[in-house]
Amino acid sequence: MKIVIPGGSGQLGTILARELIAQDHQVIVLSRKPFLAPWPVVLWDAKNLGGWQASFDNADVVINLAGRSVNCRYNPENRSQILNSRVDATRVVGKAISNASTPPRVWLQASTATIYSHRFDSPNDDIRGVLGGNEPNVPDTWKFSIDVARAWEHAAEELDLPGTRRVLMRAAMTMSPEQDGVFAVLVGLVKRGLGGTNGDGAQYVSWIHDIDFVRSVFWLIDHDLSGPINLSSPNPLPNADFMRILRKAAKIPVGLPATRWMLELGAIFLKTETELILKSRRVVPSKLLASGFKFQFPTWEQAAEDLMTRWNSRQLTC
C-alpha cells in the first residue's frame, strides 16, 4: 500500500512508518521541517495546499497526525497554536483528499481520548461515551482541551468525501520505550523515587501499548470501521494502581506521592499542565473489541513488564 502520514515526524509517526516500511509498504511523511529518514519526507506548511498534495494521488491511506504538542502551559499563544495547528492541518488534508485524482480509500485522523468527560463511575466508550466540557466546576484548561478535540474532529468532517472512509482515532496515551515519550517521563520519575500516587490516586489512567497502537491502526485500515474509534487498552485503572504496577516493573518498591498542590507547583516549573495527570480518563475501546480486535497487551501489568524490558535494553545499547 501507499500510505501518506501528514505530521509523521513525531514519535507516533516514526513508530508507524517504521513498521509500515518493515512490511514493505510505501510510506511518505509530510513534515514542516526536513529530516533524514528511511522513507521520503515531503515539506508542507500544514495549512495551505501546495506541491505536497501530489503525494495523495493514488495513495491507499492517509494517516493525519499533525498538531502541536500539548505538553506546555496553556497560555493564550500556546492555546492558539494547539488549536490552529490541528484544525488547519486537518482541513487542508481534507481538501487534498477531495482534490486527488484517485483519492485514498481510508483517512485515519488523529483525535484524543481527552474529549470524554472526567468520570469515575463507569467507562466512556465510543458508542455511548459522554463528551466532556460541561461537568460542574470543570477547570478551564480541561475545557480547553475538550473544545480543541471537538473542533479537531469537526474539521475532519467538513467535506463530503464519498470515496474515502473516515476514522477519528480517539487515542489514549501511547506507551513506548522510545526517548522523549510519556513512558520515558514516567520511568524517569520512578527511578528518582518520585513515582508515587499523583493527587488522591483515584483518577483513571487510559493508555495503550505502542505495539497495540500500531496493530489497531492496521486493523482500522483493513476493517470497515468509521467515525470515532477509541484506541485504548480495555483496562484503564486508577492512578494509584497504575504507578504501583510501574514501580513493580521497574523494581523500585517505593515512590514519593505528590499532592495536588505539589503537582500544580511542579507543572509551573516544568511548563506543562496538571490536566495530563489529574483528569480521570476512563476510556474503553468498545468498537475495536466488537469488531474482533484482540489486544496483545490488554492489562497494564503485561504492558509495563514488556515496556520496562525494552526500556532497559535500549539503555544498554545507547
How should each PLM-predicted stretch be described?
Residues 115-117, 164-184:
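Flexible, glycine-rich beta-alpha linker
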Residues 35-92:
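NAD(P)H-binding glycine-rich loop region in Rossmannoid oxidoreductase-like domains
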Residues 274-318:
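C-terminal amphipathic/interface module of NAD(P)-dependent oxidoreductases
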Residues 136-166:
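Active-site Tyr-X1-5-Lys
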Residues 91-142:
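Conserved Rossmann-fold NAD(P)-dependent oxidoreductase catalytic core, especially the SDR/UDP-sugar
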Residues 160, 187-196, 202-237:
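Alpha-helical substrate-binding/gating segment
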Residues 2, 216, 220-271, 305-318:
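Mid/C-terminal beta-alpha module of Rossmann-like enzyme folds, strongest
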Residues 3-23:
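N-terminal Rossmann NAD(P)H-binding glycine-rich loop of SDR-like oxidoreductase domains
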